[in-house]
């Protein structure tokens, strides 16, 4: 796995346990070639810096998604290994399930359960598909992501910081239940460790917490920030990073804050939701999103608290402080700075 220059974490499991984990999940390359039609383009679900993901069908009828590391990739080997060792030890209904692994003939492949509705961003930000997400489904997605993060941060045998939580890394099953995926950048915390530091900041602009972008500091509260951004996106149907890829002058956090202070935040609720739902619940979710995206990591709620806030409207919420706002990228495409949203 990639070395961190500081705060190196002691692994909570031994290399011998790692080997046993890998060996127990091995599958042969011939089975995967047959399942994916020889990794046919027609079965390709998507592609990233690590390589491609293919849909496949095993002989027993199970549908799978095969993540294949590109042979030309240099940085992906460590991330693939990291993902394998992490996900194999994590079991939760709101995390994507690792089925097996193949390490034959210079191939490096991770085999996951197939999640039919693809990623959240492909539905939420598609003008035709977003109508499939009524308020009940959106609330279920928000709550499911929260429970998955609570498990990673507090309830699993490992304490895991995802570091790349975003709409494209949340998959939706047949019933639109969310499953957090892509653990290539995730990090383990051992013992009493509460944060890590890295000189190589990786992630997606618009979802990364300010302390991570500016100083390389990451913790469970970095994931809480990313979750808050996603909550605001799910309620409004707007991308936070639109202002970095278009001529929009302000990001979603600033927009929500301006409407919050003006008492008009309900105007930002996705209009495709219509009127047959509780706008109060939607506004409460936006309130939670603002609490999660405040600049001070210590002020952001733990995910267990977020789950409680979502589970009962009798849990009182404190007034949200000004969220962190990303200044718009300049015309040359260079990195922009972060600031605090103004009222």
Regions found by a protein language model. Give the residues of each.
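Conserved eukaryotic protein kinase-like
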Residues: 1-343
């Amino acid at each position: 796995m990639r070395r961190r220059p500081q705060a190196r974490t002691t692994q909570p499991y031994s290399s011998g346990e790692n080997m046993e984990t890998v060996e127990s999940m091995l599958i042969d390359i011939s089975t995967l070639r047959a399942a994916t039609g020889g990794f046919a383009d027609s079965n390709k679900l998507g592609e990233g810096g690590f390589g491609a993901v293919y849909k496949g069908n095993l002989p027993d009828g199970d549908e799978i998604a095969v993540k294949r590391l590109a042979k030309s990739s240099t940085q992906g080997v460590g991330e693939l290994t990291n993902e394998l060792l992490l996900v194999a030890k994590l079991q939760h209904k709101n995390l994507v399930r690792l089925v097996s692994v193949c390490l034959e003939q210079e191939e490096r492949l991770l085999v996951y359960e197939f999640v039919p509705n693809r990623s959240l961003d492909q539905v939420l930000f598609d003008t035709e598909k977003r109508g499939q997400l009524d308020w009940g489904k959106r609330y279920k997605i928000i709550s499911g992501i929260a429970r998955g993060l609570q498990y990673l941060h507090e309830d699993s045998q490992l304490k895991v910081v995802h570091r790349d939580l975003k709409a494209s890394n949340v998959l939706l099953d047949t019933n639109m239940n969310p499953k957090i995926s892509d653990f290539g950048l995730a990090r383990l915390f051992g013992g009493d460790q509460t944060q890590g530091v890295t000189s190589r900041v990786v992630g997606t602009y618009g979802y990364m917490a300010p302390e991570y972008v500016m100083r390389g500091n990451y913790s469970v509260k970095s994931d809480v920030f990313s979750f808050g951004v996603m909550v605001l996106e799910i309620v409004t149907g707007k991308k936070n990073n639109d202002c970095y890829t278009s001529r929009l002058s302000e990001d979603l956090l600033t927009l929500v804050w301006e409407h919050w202070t003006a008492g008009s935040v309900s105007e930002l609720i996705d209009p495709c939701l219509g009127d047959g739902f509780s706008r109060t619940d939607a506004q409460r979710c936006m309130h939670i999103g603002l609490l999660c995206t405040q600049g001070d990591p210590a002020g952001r709620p733990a995910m267990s608290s977020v789950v409680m806030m979502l589970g009962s409207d009798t849990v009182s919420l404190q007034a949200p402080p000004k969220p962190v706002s990303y200044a718009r990228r300049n015309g040359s495409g260079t990195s922009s700075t972060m600031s605090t949203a103004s009222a």
